Amino acid sequence: MRTKARTDPAEQNGGKARRSLTEKRRKTGTHDFPKDGQGWLGAVQAGADERRIPTEGEKENGEDGDFPNKHGGSRAMYAEIQKHTEDIEERGAFIRQPNAFIQPFGDKEGGLKAEANRFGIYWATGCNWSNRPIIVRELLGLQDVISETRVSPSGETNRYGHAFGQYPDFKDPATGAYFLSEFYKRANPDFKGRATTPTLVDVKEKKAVNNDYHRLTNYLEVQFRPFQPKDAPDLYPKKFRKEIDEFNDWLFPHINNGHYRMAFCQSPEAYDEAYEDFYESLDKLDKRLETNRFLFGDYITDSDVRAYVTLIRWDVSYFHNVGPVKKPIRDYKNIW
C-alpha cells in the first residue's frame, strides 16, 4: 500500500502504521491473533500476549491468591502479584505506586531537552505500559534517535528491580548496569520504591530521567517531532490534544488499570467494584466506536495505542488471572 504525505495520515495509519504494529509482535512476545476481527482491534491488527496459568495444585494450596466473589469463578493470579503488598490500601484495593521521575520535556525552566542519541527506553515485553512508547517510537521513526533496551525479571527482582539477563555478561550494553534500579539510585540516592518500566534513561549520565508512562508517548510525539521523518503519522494532533488528554485520563483508571485493579486487589469488595467498572467502561468504549473507525475518527492517535496494548491481551491472557469473564473482547462488535 502506498503511503501518502503527512497531510493524509489515514492512509499511513491504515497501511504503514498497521504493518509497523504487526511487526511489534516480535517486540512484545506475541503470537498471531485471529484475523476475523472487523472492528477497531481488527483495524489496528496485532497480537496477544500469553502468560502462565497456575496449576490445579497451586490453586488447591491457595497459591493463586483467590477469594470468593459474587461473580463466581476463580482469580488465577500469578504468585508475584502477592508481593505488591505496598500497593494495597486498607480496604484491599490496588493503588498503583506513583511515578518517581516526572520531569517533563519542554522549554520551561528545568525541562528536559530532546536530543538524538541521548536517551534510551528501558522496557519489559510483558508490560503494557512499556509497549506504548516502544510502539510509538517505531511508528514515528525514532529508532535511530532513541535507543531501546529490554529488561527481564531475575532472582533479585524484588530487591534490585529488573535485570539484563538476555545480554552478554548480564549487563546493559549501553551503560554497563546490572539492574534497572541502578539508574534510579544514580538519579536519587534516597529512592526506596520499585524500579518500574518503562523508564527513560539518560544513557550518557546513566541515570533515570522519566518514568511517567502517562506522558512519555506525548513527549515522543511532540518534543521529538523535529527528529521524525516527514511522513511520520501525527498521533497527537493539536486540534484534538485537549480531547485526547481528557479521553486518556478516563481510559487509564477504567480500562488500562482495570485489569490490575481486579488482579492485584486483596478483598472481594474491591474486586467487585473493579469488575463492574471495567465492563461498564468497555460498553462505553464499544458505543464510541459505533460511528468511529478509530477513537478519534479516521486516524490512529495516541489514545488508540494506549487502548490497544491493554485490550489486545484480554482474551488470551488477562482473563486467566482476574477471575470470571463477563464478556470476551471478541464479543464487542465495534472493538473487535
Model-derived regions, located:
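Short, flexible loop/turn elements at secondary-structure junctions
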Residues: W123-W129, S152-G155, Y184, V201-E205, ...
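GST-like fold's C-terminal all-alpha helical module
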Residues: K192-A195, V203-K204, A208-W336
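N-terminal regions that are enriched for targeting/export leaders
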Residues: G62-N117
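Short, strongly patterned local motifs
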Residues: W40-G47
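Intrinsic disorder/low-complexity segments enriched in small, polar and charged residues
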Residues: T3-T7, N13-G15, R19, K24-T30, ...
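Local sequence-structure signature of Cys/Sec-based thiol-disulfide redox active-site neighborhoods
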Residues: G106-R159
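Structural micro-motif
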Residues: G161-V201
